[in-house]
Swiss-Prot record:
Protein name (database record): Large ribosomal subunit protein bL33c
Predominant location category: plastid
An annotated Gene Ontology molecular function: structural constituent of ribosome
GO biological process: translation
Organism: Acorus calamus (Sweet flag)
Amino acid sequence: MAKGKDARLTVILECTSCVRNGVNKESPGISRYITQKNRHNTSSRLELRKYCRYCYKHTIHGEIKK
């Protein structure tokens, strides 16, 4: 039997340095990753260090609203 709400949510992680600097002419876009998090274990916003292909380095990617 299924319990009301699922524990796992699909979340989108977005590069914080691309967003902070804005999308300039050198950067063609903003890096985004799609992943899952467990709502019971991680109730706060998720932040992970991932590789940004527009900044060419590892940066902090934070969870955004859909």
